[in-house]
């Protein structure tokens, strides 16, 4: 996995943009190079949002565009569309190699290693506390401000909303104050 390059495309909410930054930091810490364009990357990661149906259609169109480049790419679909569609994604588009729910991002490096054994990879478990513990260590502050996730999900189950089903039930970091303090620069 050391010599690989990757590109991340984010759809949807601010949380997805933040999660994409965490994925980028995690993969860079493993020696992978972040590319600005999918054509330059070995691995293309689509971080998806399932709030609007149009996002899923856009995802499949974008995967088609990557396939038209004519180069073999590893394609990972992560986020809420991956959670909602689960293994059905492999049937809808045969070029998808990894399907990863929003609470399993931290497993991506291992899944990439396992993929080298020619097995398509899927993980849509709700293992929220592991993600919080692992990914909080991966982020580097950028500039004078930084995002810190202290809570994710929702437990309200509104009839019109998919968040509890595709993101997770409400989860709050066990020690939000400590998490915020640990992310502050020592000179603050």
Predicted regions and their residues:
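Proteins enriched for Cys/Gly/acidic motifs involved in redox and nucleic-acid/cofactor modification
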Residues: 1-173, 177-178
């Amino acid at each position: 996995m050391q010599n690989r390059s990757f590109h991340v495309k984010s759809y949807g909410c601010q949380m997805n943009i933040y999660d994409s930054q965490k994925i980028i930091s995690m993969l860079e810490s493993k020696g992978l190079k972040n590319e600005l364009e999918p054509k330059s990357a070995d691995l293309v990661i689509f971080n998806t949002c399932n709030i609007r149906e149009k996002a899923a259609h856009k995802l499949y169109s974008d995967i088609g565009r990557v396939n038209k480049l004519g180069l073999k790419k590893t394609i990972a679909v992560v986020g809420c569309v991956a959670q909602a569609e689960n293994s059905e994604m492999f049937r809808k588009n045969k070029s998808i190699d990894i399907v990863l729910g929003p609470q399993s991002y931290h497993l991506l490096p291992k899944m990439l290693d396992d993929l080298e054994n020619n097995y398509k990879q899927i993980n849509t478990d709700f293992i929220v506390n592991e993600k919080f513990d692992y990914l909080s260590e991966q982020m580097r502050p950028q500039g004078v401000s930084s995002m810190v996730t202290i809570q994710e999900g929702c437990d309200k189950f509104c009839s019109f909303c998919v968040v509890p089903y595709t993101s997770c039930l409400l989860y709050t970091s066990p020690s939000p104050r400590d998490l915020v303090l640990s992310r502050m620069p020592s000179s603050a």
